[in-house]
Amino acid sequence: MKGKTIHKVLRLLLCISLPFIFHFSPFTLRAQDQHFSMLDLDPLLFNPAYSGFFDGTGRFGVVYRNQWASVSTPFQTVSATAEFALTRSSRNMNGLSAGLWLSADRAGTLDYGSTSASAIVSYFQGLGDGNHILSLALEAGVGQSGFSPDRMVADDATEAFVRTRALYPTLGAGAAWFWQLNESLYTKLGIAMRNINEPDISFTELSSDARLSRRLTVYARGEWRTASQWGVMPVLGFQHQRNFNELVYGCDVRWYIRESSPDFLAFSAGLLGRHGDAAAINLGVLWREWTFAFSYDANLSRLASASHTIGAFEVGVVYMIAKRSAKRSSLPCPIF
């Protein structure tokens, strides 16, 4: 018994230390600006196939991020999601889900920003004995990007521009896999491709160099119930878009205080590393059908001296129309 306890403690320490081990390793990656440190609050950002990956009939979420607060005009991002279970059969272990994802960001003295809206349809199917679930999704949306030329300092601020607003369609697809090994361990893995059509976003002239490049995302999350009230949740995410890469890694620890409906209550805390860019701390409260979360990340990149290491803070809230059982003594399937 003593040996098992030591083994659990060592695994927990390894999970917590992973963000720092990766972050200070010798290789570096270039990251994109638009991202969230609270990955689970906006799962559709990583993969449309995660639409419907929840134990309920509907889910709604909003996340706000304020980055580089030390500058005069910080980079701000907000996203909102709505997901609905259209059909769901626990007998055949399959179903259909629909989702809506909205995102907007803005920064700089030119008031440059973008807005996106996407509709998502996903189909999921249980495999084998039901411990495996495969989800496939398609996404179609529209985006707009633009800036305010009247804020430019030039002889003729509009002379070189054909337009100051670009409106374009976007297409995406994704796949996700869920595997529950036993009552104490599960994992989910997903891969997606966004901007498959690579729309034109040029403000000057139509050019292949001014297209919104395809974005590849990979996301993995697991949970291991180390005891009746504790869960360890490692996470790994990767995004690639043209010459830019982003690698995030971290681990959360969740304390389940009450698992009986309707007074479900749990707390979570974790560390996240964005390689070569930032380190973040995440805090969350899960109460009944609500999830409240806060995150703060410190800038550890070469911009740290200019930003005074002030990175970003995030706040988010998620509401789920749930169908919880009276008591959950083990990890539930995220869908059925």
Regions found by a protein language model. Give the residues of each.
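Cleavable N-terminal export/targeting peptides
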Residues: M1-D33, A322-F336
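Subset of outer-membrane beta-barrel
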Residues: Q32-F336
